[in-house]
């Protein structure tokens, strides 16, 4: 399962805010780190600063936690 930059992927990490959501791979690190895929999503998570709109729309995942959409 070779995931590369620009691929649309579905998140399979159950504890993730974006579980079963589809995102676009922003980058893939090949240096051997565990969570080597940066995935960008359309919606933001709940981690915005109090009183402001917004939050994070990217997260790192291992390739084993993703499947191509």
UniProtKB/Swiss-Prot annotation:
Report how it sits in the membrane. Answer: Peripheral membrane protein
Transferase as a keyword of this entry, yes or no, is: no
Query: Biological process GO terms, please?
Result: photosynthesis
Q: What is an example of a Pfam family matching this protein? A: PSI_PsaE
Q: What are its GO cellular component terms?
A: photosystem I reaction center; plasma membrane-derived thylakoid membrane
Q: What is its main location?
A: membrane
The domain of life for this entry's organism is Bacteria
Q: Which cysteines are joined by disulfide bonds?
A: none
The UniProt entry, under SUPFAM superfamilies, shows: Electron transport accessory proteins
Question: Could you tell me the keywords of this UniProt record?
Answer: Membrane, Photosynthesis, Photosystem I, Thylakoid
Question: What subcellular locations does the record give?
Answer: Cellular thylakoid membrane
The record's similarity note reads:
Belongs to the PsaE family.
NCBIfam families assigned: PRK02749.1
What does the UniProt function comment say about this protein?
Stabilizes the interaction between PsaC and the PSI core, assists the docking of the ferredoxin to PSI and interacts with ferredoxin-NADP oxidoreductase.
Q: What name does this protein carry? A: Photosystem I reaction center subunit IV
Q: Which organism is it from?
A: Prochlorococcus marinus subsp. pastoris (strain CCMP1986 / NIES-2087 / MED4)
